[in-house]
Amino acid sequence: MNLETIYDDYLERLQEERKELYKGYEKWFSGSSAGSCYKKQWYKINEFEAEPFDARTKRLLRLGTIVHADFEKAIHEAEPQDNVKVLLEHEVKIPELNIVGHLDHCLLRNDGKNTEIYISDLKTLAQYSWTSKFGRNAKKASINSVQQSFGHYELQVATYALGILKEVMADDLADFNTSKINFDIEQILHNISINIIWYSKNDSKMKTTEISTDALHAALAYWNGLNDFINEDNLIETIPPNGAIGIPMQDWECRYCQHSKICKGS
């Protein structure tokens, strides 16, 4: 009996079950892919078959899933607070931008006049990623930096925040395809707190960082740019890596892309 094989087969079954969550949304973008390469997104909505993850990657992803499940259970079993609604693994949709996804945690407090929204997304990090983000050199770079930038994780949770805003504050927001949406977002920024909970897989350290609400505008700009690029029919399949802005978004993407074998351009 090979226990590694048994476990890997189990993870494969779980992955197939998870696909059921997105059945019917095959041609939608995933909120978790915010900030990704435009061509990778194009492959996804056109249902090109991706290279499967290797066994090691599946195990790493499973560790993150287990920690997520623990957090959800802890929040679910916590003492309820007055006037607070708790959303866990909540589906968010923004049809105007062709986005669907699942937000980890959202707390909604309504006092009868105002709605306050607290959003958090849990991210598990390996040692190198944790040190890169929170180590001494990272702190020094942060102090010396004067430019606000948002990475993949920040854009992801900001995308979920946009979906929640659309769902619970629809009367305050314009259509997401209009230029007025940026103005409308500015009017409700005091209602929302966007956060990432970081969990070290190496030593179980945890940190929570609040993300600037500027990330809402950055996420909106990314998704509008992606939709515009794809709708313009730029013969995307023929564009090689670095052949256009957004292909890829970051240099490291190609090394881990599940479509790298077919992404050669012409």
What is each residue range found by the language model?
Residues 1-119, 126-134:
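Metal-dependent nuclease catalytic cores that hydrolyze phosphodiester bonds in DNA/RNA
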Residues 5, 147-151, 162-266:
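Metal-dependent nuclease catalytic regions and adjoining charged, substrate-binding loops involved
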Residues 55, 59, 63, 145-152, ...:
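Conserved aromatic-histidine-acidic binding/catalytic patches
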Residues 66, 70, 155-163:
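Short amphipathic alpha-helical face segments that pack within enzyme cores
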Residues 97-98, 151-156:
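Short, glycine/acidic-rich beta->alpha junctions
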Residues 123-126, 200:
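A short beta-strand motif that forms part of the nucleic acid-binding face
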Residues 129-146:
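A solvent-exposed, charged loop/short amphipathic helix patch at secondary-structure junctions
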